[in-house]
């Protein structure tokens, strides 16, 4: 999404909706974001943009090392403010969470690794990852699934976008034991948030020149919850007559993605479905190591891998694929209006993959993470030496 102005067009679209009162908070936030851009421009004059970095768990720290090494070699004017938050390394507390939130709110932009959520219930249902999303209102997760030239997969020349609502739905952390051995889990679906993510998807399609939006749902079974989501998507679709609108049941969508993914352009869906489809679609173009992602609120932008996987079994083995994180970092630079550096890094990563001499194990090669980083750095200035 292009720079900080991307938030402005989204907010203007939301404010122009039929119920302006529903978007009043976003309008106020957009004004704050505009002010933050002025602050960022001041920082740029001084030499760097402040960005919050959250390495996370698993191979996250190794991937962030790759980002820092490539940024250093490319002379990117970004200053990382690094924080550590982990539920599995005893590095989590309310104080640490507030420190991270404070940094992210001040900088408006962050790059993060996967914060692993343990299976065990320890008295708190909401993970730190989920709490960060809620407190920053990171309602829209965007994953651009695109084939990488030179890397052959079963389906090539894919180009589709998955937009996921990620502040409600099944991830509402509302569970309780109503009777011994009986657990009730509540799925929350609201008109305001369903309208908001639908408008985001159609605005995204309009801005990016895409022709179709597919709403993914299970309204045939969850007639009220997913029924409301689907109704909101249908209502918003009427405001965009130039964008083709389709609906598809989630289970059929999974099958269609495997059989004929070329039929899709932009897909919009509730929280849990988005989490599943993100990972499924990433597998179509090479897996979790090659697909970047990002999350947006009206004020903040967070850049991460598209398929959130800590890859704990690879920790310390120097085999993690930094492609997804480097491409996400490139998208972050574009968001900051650092187009030159963004293109330089993205082009270097894609050249390494296209040449095919340096590939990590997940891509069928034997190269290490370090090998990949060095190769990317070597392709940053192909005509400069």
Curated annotation (Swiss-Prot):
Gene3D superfamilies to which the protein is assigned, alphabetical: Isopropylmalate Dehydrogenase
Alphabetized PROSITE patterns for the sequence: IDH_IMDH
Quaternary structure (record): Heterooligomer of subunits alpha (IDH3A), beta (IDH3B), and gamma (IDH3G) in the apparent ratio of 2:1:1. The heterodimer containing one IDH3A and one IDH3B subunit and the heterodimer containing one IDH3A and one IDH3G subunit assemble into a heterotetramer (which contains two subunits of IDH3A, one of IDH3B and one of IDH3G) and further into the heterooctamer.
Function of the molecule: Plays a structural role to facilitate the assembly and ensure the full activity of the enzyme catalyzing the decarboxylation of isocitrate (ICT) into alpha-ketoglutarate. The heterodimer composed of the alpha (IDH3A) and beta (IDH3B) subunits and the heterodimer composed of the alpha (IDH3A) and gamma (IDH3G) subunits, have considerable basal activity but the full activity of the heterotetramer (containing two subunits of IDH3A, one of IDH3B and one of IDH3G) requires the assembly and cooperative function of both heterodimers.
GO MF terms held by the record: magnesium ion binding; NAD binding; oxidoreductase activity, acting on the CH-OH group of donors, NAD or NADP as acceptor
Name of the encoding gene: IDH3B
Pfam families referenced in this protein's UniProt entry, alphabetically: Iso_dh
Disulfide links within the chain: none
GO terms (BP aspect): isocitrate metabolic process; tricarboxylic acid cycle
Name of the protein described by the UniProt record: Isocitrate dehydrogenase [NAD] subunit beta, mitochondrial
Residue range of the transit peptide in the UniProt record, numbered on this chain: 1-34
Organism: Macaca fascicularis
Free-text activity regulation comment from the record: The heterotetramer and the heterodimer composed of IDH3A and IDH3G subunits can be allosterically activated by citrate (CIT) or/and ADP, and the two activators can act independently or synergistically. The heterodimer composed of IDH3A and IDH3B subunits cannot be allosterically regulated and the allosteric regulation of the heterotetramer is through the IDH3G subunit and not the IDH3B subunit.
Residues found modified as N6-acetyllysine: 199
A GO term from the CC aspect: mitochondrion
Keyword ATP-binding listed: no
Keywords attached to this entry: Acetylation, Mitochondrion, Transit peptide, Tricarboxylic acid cycle
Compartmental location: Mitochondrion
Protein family: Belongs to the isocitrate and isopropylmalate dehydrogenases family.
SUPFAM superfamilies the record matches: Isocitrate/Isopropylmalate dehydrogenase-like (SSF53659)
Main location: mitochondrion
Acetylation listed as a keyword: yes
């Amino acid at each position: 999404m292009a720079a900080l102005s991307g938030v402005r067009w989204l907010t203007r679209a939301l404010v122009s909706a039929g119920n302006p009162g529903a978007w009043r908070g976003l309008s106020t936030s957009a004004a704050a974001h505009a002010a933050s851009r002025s602050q960022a421009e001041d920082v740029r004059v001084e030499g760097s943009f402040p960005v919050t970095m959250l390495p996370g768990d698993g191979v996250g720290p190794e991937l962030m090392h790759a980002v820092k090494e490539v940024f250093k070699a490319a002379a990117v004017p970004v200053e990382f403010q690094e924080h550590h938050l982990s539920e599995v390394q005893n590095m989590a507390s309310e104080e640490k969470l507030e420190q991270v939130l404070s940094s992210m709110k001040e900088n408006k932009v962050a790059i993060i690794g996967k914060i692993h959520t343990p299976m065990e219930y320890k008295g708190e249902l909401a993970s730190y990852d989920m709490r960060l999303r809620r407190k920053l209102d990171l309602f829209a997760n965007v994953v651009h699934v695109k084939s990488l030239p030179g890397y052959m997969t079963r389906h090539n020349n894919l180009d589709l976008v998955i937009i996921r609502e990620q502040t409600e739905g099944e991830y509402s952390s509302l569970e309780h034991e109503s009777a011994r051995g009986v657990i009730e889990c509540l799925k929350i679906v609201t008109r305001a948030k369903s309208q908001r993510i639908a408008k985001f998807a159609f605005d995204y399609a309009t801005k990016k020149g895409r022709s179709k939006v597919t709403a993914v749902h299970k309204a045939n079974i969850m007639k009220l919850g997913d029924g409301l989501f689907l109704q909101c998507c249908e209502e918003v679709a009427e405001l965009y007559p130039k964008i083709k609108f389709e609906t598809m049941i989630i289970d059929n969508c999974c099958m269609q993605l495997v059989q004929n993914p070329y039929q899709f352009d932009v897909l919009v869906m509730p929280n849990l479905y988005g989490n599943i489809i993100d990972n499924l679609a990433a597998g179509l173009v090479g897996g979790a190591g090659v697909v970047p992602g990002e999350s947006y609120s009206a004020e903040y932008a967070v850049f991460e891998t598209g398929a959130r996987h800590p890859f704990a079994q690879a920790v310390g083995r120097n085999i993690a694929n930094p492609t997804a994180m480097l491409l996400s970092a490139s998208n972050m630079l574009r968001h900051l209006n650092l187009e030159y550096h963004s293109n330089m890094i993205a082009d270097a990563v894609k050249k390494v993959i296209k040449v095919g001499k340096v590939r990590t194990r997940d891509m069928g090669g034997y190269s290490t993470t370090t090998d990949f980083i060095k190769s990317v750095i070597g392709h940053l200035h192909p005509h400069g030496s």
